[in-house]
């Protein structure tokens, strides 16, 4: 079978970049200095950044490294010319943004365009993706397609889609934000996605569907890889009942839970686990009963108003961590409230957690979902291998426009981060707390989210705190959400990690076109 018709497989990549070493396309950069664009004084849109965005788009279309390596990429001041399926003479053109659009973005103006399909999709996809929503690309109506066929051999993109992919995945808009909530977080209401009503759509992954359609139009013999839903469920162990706190005892008494009340009273005995610690075992077992995997994220922060301050080296906690290890359940990290924007505090807590969890690859998320662009850099400095913080506390949805794990681009450093981002989509307290949804509406909202993940072959991610099981309505809702997630494939983050951190093509020398 020829590379052009081979069914694409998940790319394999080497340690510090994006593209697979076998998939180094021919790169021609014509007058590379002219190909660099700027948004304000600090953000440079370089040829390597555009190649990164092109790969992120291509892999979301199901493009294999074998197919990608046959392409020729020519980058010039006016845009990127992509020769795909070269034996057939097929070409795709991605224009660079006009200077006036870059000036708009420099003024923090964020125009949003709506685009249509090249070819009408099937009704199931059409229901989920009626059009393409394209931020940072100028304004237009949905009558103009995202990709326009100028002949049977050439297709042109009608916006600077590579810039859009780059800015959305890198969270550029958060770098210029001036308003934050009382925890220093970028709130959903400040995002262009919330303001324009597309926070619950994985727009970057939807561009992959459009690009897949373009490739099929140019070469009907080509087929993308099958898209399958995967799931990664996790539990933030904010509270484990150690050290003993009277308010926990009072909480169980008020709820009328005799079992948990006595567990809290006798939790100091050697063989009795406090109710919150026991809940770690319980929530893992509940999740596994639906044939789904869990991960538990532990803390090592000192006591504070926002941190319970337990010691992960406590013998009872170690006993649960050992049990998780024996059960094949991942244990990860949850750096405390004060580690946000504090790399030194972060390093101290990670070092403590490594003493308990071991020296292997570790991932997790920030406590309180406190995240900013520097978080990627700080986690990278600590040797952490994946982050799963990127979600709004106050609204479910696709903060990064994607449900497909990816290697983030660091705009400030003009390079990819040496870690994987596994975007978080749903948190327990978001549904019943911040959004004030009832159980039925919560299930409906998550079901829509899962349907969109399935359509693009993404990873459905959700965090449910261990002690949430103490509350009947949270326990009831969790089991209902597990039921609609049941059947999703396991997300193998270690395999994804080894394939994602590959040999970056922008580090290789490029031939200069004439």
Locate predicted features.
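Catalytic domains of cell-wall/extracellular-matrix polysaccharide-remodeling enzymes
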Residues: 64-65, 74-78, 337-416, 462, ...
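A subset of signal/propeptide-processing and intrinsically disordered low-complexity segments
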Residues: 7-11, 329, 382, 389-392
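Conserved hydrophobic/aromatic pocket- or pore-lining residues that grip, position, or stack substrates
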Residues: 236, 334, 379
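Terminal accessory/targeting
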Residues: 1-312, 404, 411-514
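Metal-dependent polysaccharide deacetylase catalytic core of the NodB/CE4 family, i.e.
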Residues: 239, 243, 263-264, 281-371, ...
